[in-house]
Amino acid sequence: GLFDVVKGVLKGVGKNVAGSLLEQLKCKLSGGC
């Protein structure tokens, strides 16, 4: 139902946020920012 859709969207957003945070961390560690 609707709750499943919302949960799926939140999971997708969470994955995107985690991915971008990891990218920023890698960037800082490699000094390439």
UniProtKB/Swiss-Prot annotation:
Cell location: Secreted
Tissue specificity remark: Expressed by the skin glands.
S-S bonds: 27-33
GO cellular component, one term: extracellular region
One Pfam family in the UniProt entry: Antimicrobial_2
The keyword Protease belongs to this UniProt entry's keyword annotation: no
Keyword tags: Amphibian defense peptide, Antibiotic, Antimicrobial, Disulfide bond, Secreted
GO terms (BP aspect): defense response to bacterium
Superkingdom per UniProt: Eukaryota
Family (UniProt): Belongs to the frog skin active peptide (FSAP) family. Brevinin subfamily.
The protein's role, per its UniProt record: Antimicrobial peptide. A mixture of Brevinin-2DYc/2DYd is active against the Gram-positive bacterium S.aureus (MIC=15 uM) and the Gram-negative bacterium E.coli (MIC=15 uM).
Name this protein carries in UniProt: Brevinin-2DYc
Provenance organism: Rana dybowskii
